[in-house]
Amino acid sequence: GITDSGVDEFIEDTMNGGHQINDRSLVTVMAEESSDAVDWLDSIGAPLPKVAATGGTTHKYLHEPEDGSAVGSYLVEKLNAQAEKLGVQIMLNTEATEILTENGAAVGIKAKSKEHDYTIHAKSVIIAAGGFGANFDLMASFNPALANAVTTNHAGATGDGILMAEAIGADTVDMDQIQLHPTVYQETGLLVSESVRSMGGILVNAEGKRFCNDLATRDAVSNAELEQPGAYAYIIFDQRIVDDLKSCQKYIKNGLTVSADNYEDLAKAMGLEGDAIQNFVDTMDTWNAAVAAGEDKEFGRSNGMDADLSTAPYYAIKIAPGIHHTMGGLKINTDAEVLDTQGNAIPGLYAAGETTGGVHGGNRIGGNAVCDFVVFGRIAGNNASAYAAN
């Protein structure tokens, strides 16, 4: 969590990252409650002790597991264990299909599995069904260019929670704001963690050259990549980063990387030819000198420069932009209540996480998805519980 003195900077970084179309009231709550959110995760056995800078931030806000594991799967495991500890019933392979209402209030859901149809009555309903980054028809309705893009999202990220709430009058916001992440392995849609760059990794193009501030906002880096020859790049890292990031060890194990003991041989392993090989060697030397000097004169990068790339062996992964996060979704207030098209709260209906819109605006800052869903998930849970009790 961030200290009180860092709250204002966190708010402004998030607003600037989202191109100022975010809902400032939601961003403010997320920032103010972020420290408690991290403490709460720690209290249930899901500590995130490592901190790092991420694209577009002025400070180290990104919280990670100690061993550098991917934070998403790490938290799913920990949160699932906590749910089981509390006796929460989880119905797998069961699809929610409809939100039930009575006198305008949410009073339950309909759901179905292969074997059964269910009607589940409840005193309040929370939608935490994720975004729509795997619903290509829906995304293409806002941006036709995304119809054939690679996505990092799981197959269930189809926006069903948003659509079900819309069917009972819920409003949406920023549905056309869809984020491309710059470091996606195109063959499988696997996201190469932003932490690789936060720890000092860089991006080079097919000519062996850096082409942008590698840790600018995700949209800026993605757009810069798309302008490079072939519209792809390579992410470069060294053994120091591999030793610190468990996710990198998985990339190697799964065959995403090429590697070598020196820069020239890595360039050849990447498939670079001719002048591009020497360009790459020069790029690496220039970058290491920039880290030593504490100044990136080429592109103005100012974070993720705590250590250079000089620990052999060296690694590269060929990457390009891919769909990652849908910033738009259900319109909520700071109590995580879902709003209707007149701006009124729908009684008994709450939402949190990527199902909602307004927090991230036109671009999400790395690390803010976890902050968003923990902060507003807790708010939704507490308020839905209080509503049900009353």
Task: Outline where the language-model segments fall.
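Internal hydrophobic alpha-helix adjacent to the cofactor/substrate pocket in enzyme cavities
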Residues: G161-D171, E273, I277, V281-M284, ...
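A glycine-rich dinucleotide-binding beta-alpha-beta segment and adjacent secondary-structure elements
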Residues: E98, Q278-N363
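Helical element adjacent to the flavin cofactor pocket in flavoenzyme catalytic cores
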Residues: D67-K123, I162-I168, L330-K331
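Short glycine-enriched, charge-decorated loop/helix-capping segments at active-site entrances
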Residues: E64-E66, N143-T151, K250-N254, N363-N368
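Conserved N-terminal/central alpha/beta ligand/cofactor-binding core
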Residues: G1-E98, L203-L215, P229-A231, R240-D243
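An anion/pyrophosphate-binding glycine-rich loop and adjacent beta-alpha core
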Residues: I162-D275
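Glycine-rich loop(s) and the adjacent beta-strand/alpha-helix scaffold that form part
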Residues: S113, I120-Y185, G189, F376-I379
